[in-house]
Structures are given as structure tokens and as C-alpha cells.
């Protein structure tokens, strides 16, 4: 009986995955589970040489802290699952 109870507890812990696993987009429609310790999703945008033709470059990912920005970059951070979709996904 004790063995059965212990087995149920272990299975429950494994199934629940007690660690807080954040899911962020790492690319267009590409959600991934972040590594342990990375509790933020981010969206970074900037213009490159093709900005007028293609629009801003967009980088999506996971981070432990919100990335620092350079003067020409825009960075947005959030802490909920899938809170950083590609801007093209939001408009659908």
C-alpha cells in the first residue's frame, strides 16, 4: 500500500512538472519552453539596411532579465506564456 502511494506521488510530481516553465515564442508561430531561470519573454525590434523594403527586424526569445537596448532598438518584455507573439500573428 505504501509503495502504491509513493508511486502515485512520484507520478503526480513528474506529470505536474513542479518547476515554473515559461513558454515564449522564439520565432514566427514557434513557441518553445524556456530554460530554467529564464522567466521573461521578449520582443526586440530594430531597423537594418533593408528596413524600408522589409520592415523592422524582429527577434523573439526567452531571458532571465529584460535585454538592454541600444538607442535604435525597441524591447518589450512580459512574463506570461506566449505573451510575445510575432506582430504579424497579432493582426490575424
From Swiss-Prot:
Coiled coil: none annotated. Its main location: secreted. One of its GO terms (cellular component) is extracellular region. InterPro entries: Snake_3FTx, Snake_toxin-like_sf, Snake_toxin_con_site, Toxin_cobra-type. Keywords: Acetylcholine receptor inhibiting toxin, Disulfide bond, Ion channel impairing toxin, Neurotoxin, Postsynaptic neurotoxin, Secreted, Signal, Toxin. The keyword Secreted applies. Expressed by the venom gland. Residues 1-21 form the signal peptide. SUPFAM superfamilies: Snake toxin-like. Disulfide bonds join 24-41, 34-62, 47-51, 66-77, 78-83. It comes from the Eukaryota. It is found in: Secreted. Gene3D superfamilies: CD59. The keyword Disulfide bond applies. GO terms for molecular function: acetylcholine receptor inhibitor activity; ion channel regulator activity; toxin activity. Belongs to the three-finger toxin family. Long-chain subfamily. Type II alpha-neurotoxin sub-subfamily. Binds with high affinity to muscular (alpha-1/CHRNA1) and neuronal (alpha-7/CHRNA7) nicotinic acetylcholine receptor (nAChR) and inhibits acetylcholine from binding to the receptor, thereby impairing neuromuscular and neuronal transmission. This is Long neurotoxin 469.
